[in-house]
Amino acid sequence: MEENKVEKQNINGKQEVVQIPIIVSNSYNKKYYLDERLNVLPREVKDTLKIIFVKLTEEVGGVAEVSFDNTEYDLVFKTYKNDDDFNYDEINANYKLSKIEREYAEIFSQIAEFCKFKLNGLV
């Protein structure tokens, strides 16, 4: 699955990645992506992440994405849709995503800590 990296220009004029997608579930092409660097997570955690994000996109449509923001050292949760998708339920998608954030806060906190070191080359 193609990564949807968000980049910005740093002080030296070079492009640097700001948000790195680590989890993506896409209802349009029925695909799920987990960044390969997260393969070290326990199997049950990876399975849980897949279940909750695939279920979310099956219920509300569109794409659900969790990215690591390497300037804020935090996870960014978002959902979005294709322009021609009139069945996407934005309000319900954002509500359910917020609920997932709260319900699995401990797991996401640990993933954010892992990403802070692993994705920033501090390990």
Where are these regions (language model features)?
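Non-catalytic accessory regions used for complex assembly or targeting
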Residues: E2-K5, L122-V123
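Negatively charged, low-complexity tracts enriched in Asp/Glu with abundant Ser/Thr
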Residues: N4-E59
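Intrinsically disordered, low-complexity regions
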Residues: K14, G62-V63, L122
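Amphipathic protein-protein interaction modules
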Residues: T57-C115
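A broad, low-amplitude sensor of folded, mature protein cores
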Residues: L34-D47, K96-L97, R102, I111, ...
